[in-house]
Amino acid sequence: MFVKMKKYVFLFILIFAQSTLSWAETGVKPPLSYLEAMTQAHKKSTYELLYILQTEGDVESFRLRHTFMDGKEYAQLLNLDRSREEIILKNQTISYLGYNFRPFSLNTPHILDNLPNVLYADYVNLKGYVFLDSGKDRIADRIARVIRIVPNDNLRHSYTLWIDDESHLLLKSQLRSVDNAVLEEFRVLHLYRAKELELIASAIESLVLPALTSINIEALKSQHNWEVDWLPTGFNLIENQTMNGAMYKLENESIDSRLYSDGLSTLNIYVMPSQGVNFNEYAWQQGKLTILNQTVNDKDIVIIGEIPIQSAKQILQSIRFLGEAN
């Protein structure tokens, strides 16, 4: 009996070894490897993308030129529709240029506007999601590996990514609701790679860009003592501040603001004195954003985030007021 069992064990080990060897020979990598390669390619490659971004029926087209030279990142993101607006990335500085606003610069390492969040995630430390390889597809006349990022629950959105097999650049992404509706789609129409694109580094270096804008937010002490007892898996507090309500035309009032993120999605919770209108879980969806407003104990609570409405409601129900702050 023992000898027979050993034969079975040996057989299973042999089958496993053969399947592992076959997996290695095909060159198929685990999904995490594709995701890490994508983030590195976006940051350190030289390329030009013509792409569209679709959110809630609204479609805009863009051109992104990018290079990485001498340890520095350079990029130009140009809006191809309506009035000309562009964003310039020069190492750790982002400059916004356009005709309908005063140009300004911010100290930040990424272009976050009109690009999907999935490009900047730390996938090694991302919690509460599983990565699934869904095979190959063809996007913009290129072969792409399809990777799905699926939460372990129904309290966060899911993502599907199409990653170019050759360059590892993102060719397409979809942010999907718990009902599988597409909330946001990024799709490349044309990918161009050439050494000549490295010239944008010297072109950007020669530009006279707006001075860094200092955002002076008056440091105030919160008038409210409140806690959040529940958040979706992986969400952590990123920023906690109290702002002067005059900035938002709320005279002599302050607004508590807390920013949370799980590495892919973000949400904000605002608490302020009631403005005279009582809200009872007033909620709506605006593209990928959920907005929820409720009045509790003469205070207005507003939750805005890239999360399902049910998650926002659970967060709201978990907020506790512990009495007025001293």
Regions found by a protein language model. Give the residues of each.
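Bacterial N-terminal signal peptides
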Residues: 11-19
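N-terminal leader/targeting segments and the immediate start of mature chains
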Residues: 2, 6, 20-72, 136, ...
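A short, amphipathic edge element
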Residues: 122-133
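Gly/Pro-enriched, hydrophobic low-complexity segments
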Residues: 140-206
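Short, gly/Ser/Thr-rich active-site loops of penicillin-recognizing serine hydrolases
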Residues: 194-221, 326
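Short, solvent-exposed recognition patches
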Residues: 208-296, 310
